[in-house]
Amino acid sequence: GGVDIVVSNAGAPWQGKIAELPERMLRESFDLNFFSHQSVAQNAIRVMRMQDIGGVLLFNVSKQAVNPGESFGAYGLPKAAALIWVRQYALENGRYGIRANAVNADRIRSGILTPQLISERSMARGVSEEDYMKGNLLGMEVMPQDVAKAFLHQALQTKTTADVTTVDGGNISASLR
């Protein structure tokens, strides 16, 4: 056994106006949405360096990292920090053959984007749930399999590091291009 690929995808969506948010809530969000990934990465890097065969760290940073949503700052702030943090891991560990990449996904039905949250976010935007889920340039709902394929692509690209792959059907506001 050993570690050659890590996909870190933990997260939860704390909500509230940032100026009114209890500090405890923001700290809880950072603990899960940033520091849990840091703990995973530190331990994976330690093992990967001992193995001396390289490896890849893959993280879900979310579109919130580059395009914040109303009353969603508690979730978006740690994701924005994670975006730069992934690149820092790439910078500091490339010499060991260890790559670090991220996926910037949006509106994926999951444990975070639950039916209740879809209802809340679509109401906040004044659109139907279907229109909310297809609210991108392609007019197509992005599925969990689409995100999984992006992670697989990043894992297989042995000469790619510090990459952020966007999987959102086309959201110009969240585009890194």
Regions found by a protein language model. Give the residues of each.
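Conserved Rossmann-fold SDR core element
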Residues: 2, 83, 93-113, 138, ...
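Active-site loop of short-chain dehydrogenase/reductase
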Residues: 2-3, 48-62, 95-98, 163
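Catalytic Tyr-X3-Lys loop
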Residues: 12, 19-39, 58, 82
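Active-site loop-to-helix junction immediately N-terminal to the catalytic Tyr of the SDR YXXXK motif
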Residues: 21, 68-77, 88
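Active-site helix of classical SDR
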Residues: 41, 78
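Alpha-helical segment proximal to the catalytic Tyr-Lys
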Residues: 46, 91-92
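A glycine/serine/threonine-rich, flexible loop-to-helix segment
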Residues: 95, 108-135, 177
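C-terminal substrate-recognition "lid" of short-chain dehydrogenase/reductases
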Residues: 140-167, 172
